[in-house]
Amino acid sequence: MKITNKEVLQSYILTTAKYDYSVYEKRILYRIIEILQFLIEGKKLNEKYSIQITTQNDYDFQIPLSSILVNEKDENYTRIKNAFKSLQKKIIEYEDNKTWLSLNLIERPEITKNGGNSYASFRVSPMIAECFMDFSKGFRKYELKVAMEFESEYSMRFYELLSNKKTPINYSIENLKEIFGLGDKYKLTANFINKVIIPAKKELD
């Protein structure tokens, strides 16, 4: 599946989820979202990609490793493996007035090595897939090509939060740190601005 300017709808729940993911983790998540969007719209996937729903309603994905890399010169396969391991360890929390859930983001990641045709397989639970596809709380629209080309995870997060907004939107620094899952990482406001805001602004400009 070539990267094009196809707009992707991402769950508002996921966009504002409190997490701190690497660039490669974000690229994997973008591919999950894109494939699920194809499923929702009933469109046919490129033959290099597949998604199967098991008898337990789990979602089994298969994607080429090349689809996670920035371009043909990117050969950071070690970072891809680390990204899958990190995603496997992470949980996503969902909470509304009636429900609280804490779930592993992905399960059973596996990489099949075959040169330029290497691919990754992994499983997503039905509840996590529902979080990805839950548009009941609003949505953000953004272009996959743009999102995939950012080199900073913070650029990706700002792009998700601000894309398609036609009116000004304000976030406090504390609110952004909470959304980005930074905790006490940048206690000084100046450090947060220098390490997060300025690098992201350079890419977004």
Predicted regions: what they are:
Residues M1-D205:
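Charged, alpha-helix-forming regions
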